[in-house]
Amino acid sequence: SLVGSEMCIRDRVKIYLGEAGGHGIDSGETAATIHCGSLGIIHGSRTLVMQDEDGQIIEPYSISAGLDYPGIGPLHANLAQEHRATVMAVNDEEALRAAYELTRLEGIIPALESAHALGMLPRMKFRKEDVVVLTVSGRGDKDLDTYLAHRYDENLE
């Protein structure tokens, strides 16, 4: 049955979401809405929102303009609420390091938004037989000014 096959897939397929941690989820400068938001309404959707006690929007922060948003899509909020997805807040530095590594190793310049997904990888453990699918969308060349302004030099560590 479809329900049975859906349960089989649910047991075998793990979903990980990377959200923009900015300077850290405790810094006050973050866009990690799943970690730091609360239930509210934004742009007609009831979802998690970065807001104060009165429901007023709190300005989020992320190095990525595309992730610098005070809400989260209802689908992602539901995946987190139902414990169907593991959500990690990826800070700016982690995203930049991951972007530089992908560029160095593969010659692919990821958009800053996708760099946050890449930034989760160092924290994760995989088995040799695991199949990992990670989407890299957008064009990193639009973010070159940001990458150059925050140049990561692996020799400084």
Task: Give residue ranges: language-model regions.
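A short, acidic, amphipathic alpha-helical segment used as a generic capping/interface helix at domain edges
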Residues: 92-97, 116-126
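Short, small-residue-biased leader/transition segments that mark boundaries at the very start
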Residues: 2-9
